[in-house]
Amino acid sequence: MKRAETQIDQLANQLVKDQAAAYPSFATSIGYPGGEGDMDDYSPEALAQEQTDIKAVIAKLEALTPADDIDMVTKEAMLFTLRGEIETYDSGLAFRSLNNIASAAQGVRGVFDISPTATVTDWENLASRMHKVGDSLRGYARSLEEGAKRNDAPAPRQISEVIAQVDQINTADGFFHTFALNFYRCKCDVF
């Protein structure tokens, strides 16, 4: 017998939809349709809006009573994760999130690794996404600048490591050059 969808299930499902709409790279990573030609917004304004949205979800979630054990686990897991996001933001980490493994610096490039490339439409989406990289990185830079204004900047070693990564990505045989060649080859084969 199929379990009936509860209010907590509905809220959880809506959260995934909202996160996919707000973060195109998340949507791509989970195979959720929409935003294939867009990039994430890492600006201070987007970070602040995310906090407002998370607080609204927490308030709704806290008002709901679990219908069963599954709901109880869902509610607790969501609250744990969402409260952690609030704590991360309040700590200022969102404004110094730069490192050599997993930060927006890698995410902006990494989304291209997981984006579909099988069709003409896929490549059109990738071209659109590529054109939005600059805006995404400018928003990210503004967030890092906000952290620096608060005297809360990334560690110098992390900064130098990310600079080295960016330098490598932008070489003649780096990611974006190779990506553009693949686009050209695909264009010749399928257009």
Describe the residue ranges of each PLM region.
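N-terminal maturation segment of proteins
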Residues: 1-191
